[in-house]
């Protein structure tokens, strides 16, 4: 007996028509399918696409998401990665305003497409600037000759997004996505855990979620002044307390008070 999660992983790694179809290739296939559905659609955001869906779908044929954290582009002396969690603000309230199942379904689909679109804005930037990135990162080739991207999505669904990337560009990548979401009408908050590649992933993810929640607390405090986007980050290393509050109490507090915005 195996769980359905294990079954899906095994299916994703099996040969298909003599060609290995790993999970990262399926991720790219999903993105390409969404890009095809976006092609020719009217765009209602405050700014037009910064990319052409058909061209990006074609360009992605030459690239692959790394399946190992060590292949995100880190150098030996800078072996840090980042776990990024981004979440839309007040989405529950927005869905409650949809008083029929049809409206909720349409809104859910619209939010999903906007989330994918924002991620594709970043991918287009990365591909367009790939030669420059290679000067600062160690970006390898996959066995099939495709070039590894310095990022890998973990969750892309609804207003929720989690990805891993090289630490050097974590803030820039997150800013690009949050600005794209904002242009698409979704203000959001984000949390970034910066950690050694060998650091336990689940701990980094938990802290990234807590950082996003801390950013949302600031957003809610400023709510009367209108919508806003907030980002919080932390650098993790060695043995540290299990919660963000404990980490900051231990490392970012002094006799004169705290040394962070929280």
Regions found by a protein language model. Give the residues of each.
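Regulatory and interdomain segments flanking nucleotide-handling catalytic cores
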Residues: 1-262
